């Protein structure tokens, strides 16, 4: 089913290539500060305040073989299946802490919304 979805996504001109989370993690220097599209399941959702002082969320995006951290202003729920489009950063200094393998989401689409768009 996931492979079928990836094929549909790749055949749609408006959507960039969907990457495996493990591909991004395995080649962080290649994707650093570039826009990526990844999909997976949302977990460990936490409300935060972003750099501009706005309410936001951080969560983990998991696929079958890897996990990325995502920062977003779009609310998500634990267990959601989503497509995330955003800018990947392999290392960001957050005060005293270094944050690795993070996507700053620009767009988050629920997979069920994508299927509805295909049908409708």
What are these regions (language model features)?
Residues 1-11:
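Bacterial N-terminal signal peptides
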Residues 13-120:
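OB-fold and OB-like single-stranded nucleic-acid-recognition modules
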């Amino acid at each position: 089913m996931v492979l079928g979805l990836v094929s549909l996504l790749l055949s749609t001109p408006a959507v960039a290539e969907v990457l495996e989370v493990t591909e991004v993690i395995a080649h962080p220097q290649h994707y650093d500060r570039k826009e990526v599209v990844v999909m997976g399941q949302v977990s460990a959702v936490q409300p935060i305040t972003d750099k501009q002082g706005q309410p936001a969320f951080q969560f983990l995006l998991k696929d079958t073989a890897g996990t990325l951290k995502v920062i977003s202003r779009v609310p998500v729920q634990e267990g959601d299946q989503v497509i995330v489009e955003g800018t990947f950063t392999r290392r960001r200094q957050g005060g005293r802490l270094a944050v690795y393998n993070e996507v700053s989401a620009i767009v988050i689409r629920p997979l069920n919304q994508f299927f509805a768009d295909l049908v409708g």
